[in-house]
């Protein structure tokens, strides 16, 4: 595992240097290059949006990428169950309702302890995960997931465990969209639309990653800032004293009003609307916004959050914030939103070139 991590870091560093070199070259290139920067706090859905752009505009995933994602899917499936089981033993103090499933728990936990969670799921491991996922105690722990760090994709992978463990399994686009590995450094997707070369960059969302890269992108055309509106009752992975929504707003404030991006268009994706729609019925947004006095319904709550973000813009006369409610794993919905964003950017480029 240590060697694997070292290789990943080495490859990431090489990729980052290459991208930085290309960014400098782009500054000397013509105006046909349009650079978009994806920003947001960790786990907001940036990488999923980038993967959607790859599906929609860049010929999807290569066979090599699909093979890489297979190991990530296996990892995400095992890790999801192990995270729930550890939370049951720890912060939740919840037992398995069926005590006879302790043996199955040991089988799954051993996979992670041995560092084998990225390997194909054996029939024994798959059946153990499916059996545990059906346990009422595990279901209760899942419902209490805001009290510990559980990725949003956990339910998807646990629901699909049987299919994922079949011999010859090949991840489909939806599996890849839900797959999750923390972004380090910068990841890039390129595509061409109407004679414009788009280059989209996803910068790591954890605090340490953001600090490393922000200065490299002072000449981007637009920033797509992504906030996970469903995370108003959750805390950061890297700082469990900070509310995720508040962190996201603080980051948006610093980017929107940064001297690096005074003339850069701001596009706000209010992501994970599907999870927000379900959660708002159970948990009021007063968790993050004590001054909220509206109803516990989607329309009022989203409108309030939009207003909160709009108020962070210190130059509303000069800078417009384009807001979209999104579900990054819904390809059809994301296609409509991204098409709208790209059309807006193309119009601005034509205006800049004096062609409108």
Curated annotation (Swiss-Prot):
Region described as G5 motif: 326-331
GO biological process terms, semicolon-separated: adenylate cyclase-modulating G protein-coupled receptor signaling pathway; chemotaxis; cilium assembly; hyperosmotic response; olfactory behavior; response to odorant; sensory perception of smell
Keywords on record: Cell projection, Chemotaxis, Cilium, GTP-binding, Lipoprotein, Magnesium, Metal-binding, Myristate, Nucleotide-binding, Olfaction, Palmitate, Sensory transduction, Transducer
Region (G2 motif) residue ranges read: 175-183
* Gene3D superfamilies per the UniProt record, alphabetical: GI Alpha 1, domain 2-like, P-loop containing nucleotide triphosphate hydrolases
User: Segment G4 motif: which positions?
Assistant: 267-274
**Annotated signal peptide:** none
- Member of which family? Belongs to the G-alpha family.
Tell me the protein's name. Guanine nucleotide-binding protein alpha-17 subunit
Q: Which organism was this protein described from?
A: Caenorhabditis elegans
